[in-house]
From Swiss-Prot:
GO terms for molecular function: ATP binding; ATP hydrolysis activity; four-way junction DNA binding; four-way junction helicase activity. This is Holliday junction branch migration complex subunit RuvB. Residues 1-42 are annotated as: Disordered. Homohexamer. Forms an RuvA(8)-RuvB(12)-Holliday junction (HJ) complex. HJ DNA is sandwiched between 2 RuvA tetramers; dsDNA enters through RuvA and exits via RuvB. An RuvB hexamer assembles on each DNA strand where it exits the tetramer. Each RuvB hexamer is contacted by two RuvA subunits (via domain III) on 2 adjacent RuvB subunits; this complex drives branch migration. In the full resolvosome a probable DNA-RuvA(4)-RuvB(12)-RuvC(2) complex forms which resolves the HJ. The keyword Cytoplasm applies.
Length: 352
């Protein structure tokens, strides 16, 4: 039960924002809108490339719900940013033949914000909440009966005049997306019937995504050019599409070539300082500092952050994860260490 007149702050604090990077998986300001002008988002499950197990599970759930004439069960999608959680929510709505109402947890700071969304839902509609781990406690309490019993419990008034009012809600589907599934409270997480993780994409799927996006942008790329973009996008479709747009910019300025080849892709992405493995200037600065000034480590996080002029939380949350994923960096009790693979990539000899 929740009090309508209550207000509360945001549920958690976020790490300081890093400088804008072309290989950042988080959406840039111009990419924040779910509906972009270039229309690169797939609209149906059959157009959604990759995530085969996820598509199979959700496809069966959609067909079953439509067969019953009921709303799809509530869905929680989690995983790293840029893998298609928002897109999947919109695809589910399209498959169900209903609207998808899109919002994010920080926009639902006041109880009346989420109440307004819930009472205006039409039968079987999809409500998508991004960053759902950032919901306030009051917003979560409003969602509990809404998700479980399709009912909104409101307390109107204060003190001795307070009274409880229950509003019946139509059947609806809540799709929550988060990069931090562990930050969700257990009561909220337990109310989702389908909890699915999105994985990083393989090279073959990424190449298919680049080919599809190139067609929608009316670009002609060789297979090698598509593969070159796929190699550098960190397993993330959002980054792949962003790199493709940067390649388009260079191609149009360099004479508007009708066919974009791998050499032009390399030229364009080298201009943006993205190397053959997807590392950018920030990644290489960290590795270079460790190698040139500290013999490859170990070096503490605070020391690295001070030397690089970065916030420690930003360094740990934004720069390091991809280096760890590639096996170029290792976290040890004594600090950060460049691995043999990291040394080879930067052209340094391995330690004996």
């Amino acid at each position: 039960m929740a009090i309508v007149s209550s207000s509360a702050g945001r549920a958690d604090s976020q790490p300081p924002a890093a400088k804008s990077r072309v290989v950042d998986a988080s959406p840039l300001p111009e990419e924040a809108s779910p509906a972009r002008e270039d229309g690169l988002r797939p609209k149906r499950l059959e157009d959604y490339i990759g995530q085969r197990e996820l598509k199979q599970v959700l496809g069966i759930a959609v067909k079953a719900a439509m067969g019953r004439g009921d709303a799809l069960d509530h869905v929680l999608l989690y995983g790293p940013p840029g893998l298609g959680k928002t897109t999947m929510a919109m695809v589910l709505a399209e498959e169900l033949g209903v609207k998808c109402r899109v919002t994010s947890a920080p926009a639902l700071e006041r109880p009346r914000d989420i109440v307004g969304l819930l009472v205006n839902l039409q039968p079987r509609e999809v409500l998508f909440i991004d960053e759902i781990h950032r919901l306030t406690r009051v917003a979560e309490e409003l969602l509990y009966p809404a998700m479980e019993d399709r009912r909104l419990d409101l307390t109107v008034g204060k003190g001795s005049t307070a009274r409880t009012r229950a509003l019946e809600l139509p059947p609806f589907t809540l799709v929550g997306a988060t990069t931090r599934a562990g930050a969700l409270s257990s009561p909220l997480r337990d109310r989702f019937g389908l909890i699915q993780r999105l994985e990083f994409y393989g090279l073959e799927d990424l190449q298919a995504i680049v080919e599809r996006a190139a067609g929608l942008l009316r670009l002609q790329l060789t297979a090698q050019a598509c593969q070159e973009i796929a190699r550098r996008c960190r397993g993330t479709p959002r980054i792949a599409n962003r790199l493709l747009r940067r390649v388009r910019d260079v191609a149009s300025v360099c004479g508007g070539e009708s066919l974009i080849d791998a050499a032009l892709v390399d030229e364009a992405l080298t201009l943006h300082r993205v190397d053959a493995r997807g590392l950018d200037a920030s990644d290489r600065r960290l590795l270079d500092l460790l190698l040139e000034s500290h013999g490859g480590g170990p070096v503490g996080l605070e020391t690295l952050a001070a030397a690089l002029g970065e916030d420690p939380a930003t360094l740990e949350a934004v720069v390091e994860p991809f280096l760890l994923q590639l096996g170029f960096l290792q976290r040890t009790p004594r600090g950060r260490v460049v691995t043999g693979a990291g040394r080879r990539h930067l052209g340094w000899p391995e330690l004996p």
